[in-house]
């Protein structure tokens, strides 16, 4: 199985590349900037130049690839053309895959993306999902809720530095099943390698759901210190969002706040574990826990800090 990974420098993308190389797969990475992706080449991946904004560069990248793993993210930049440009890029990738007659197309979407269609990046994901399903290519659509790695900058790092942690009002009611990106990569590769697993969507979730209050408590426990927690009123977010919506240069942040506000009103961002298929249940038992992840993170960081103090 030869893989072409798009978005290989992302949190999940780099883990997929690393795991695939360890497992002996031939891995090509579509990149626009070879310098930023140099570490992928050092691992053993083949870098091929391609620009999603220039569809003519894509077909040559797909030659010889049996599976496409698209982990690329949508970036809204242009107020007037954000949707048309970005969906054009995503569909150009799909067209190149169809022409190359790939055996399977692996895509990543947002859980319940149809509920947040007022956010362009989410609408693009939803529309691309429908296009992929109608394309006739064998596909897998994964819907991750969040990765452990993203929580370090949001919670762990500020707490370790005694900096304030910001949370939204009422957001403690939101329960999210985060997963380690390394475990997610293993699941993606295992599912991709099985020919009978096709034309379905998969949740990429951990074995426990967390709210921000419990995550903060966990970080404070392992850090051995508390940090101030600042609660941002939803009403303030609403007014800021309304103001930003009037200006083109702040429209991207406006869309982000729209999504944040919508998510804060969701009561539970998880899947019913009882309804998961047998394949996912096998991996659920092997997943790395958030407790162990943070324990390792803080032990490593605090250990390095002690060494620096001793060497001072």
UniProtKB/Swiss-Prot annotation:
Its main location: plastid. The keyword DNA damage does not apply. The keyword Iron-sulfur does not apply. GO terms for molecular function: oxidoreductase activity. Transmembrane segments: none annotated. It is found in: Plastid, Chloroplast. GO terms for biological process: photosynthesis. Keywords: Chloroplast, Oxidoreductase, Photosynthesis, Photosystem II, Plastid. GO terms for cellular component: chloroplast; photosystem II. It comes from the Eukaryota. Its EC number is 1.-.-.-. Belongs to the NmrA-type oxidoreductase family. Ycf39 subfamily. Involved in assembly of photosystem II. This is Photosystem II assembly factor Ycf39. It comes from Cyanidium caldarium (Red alga). The lineage of its organism: Eukaryota, Rhodophyta, Bangiophyceae, Cyanidiales, Cyanidiaceae.
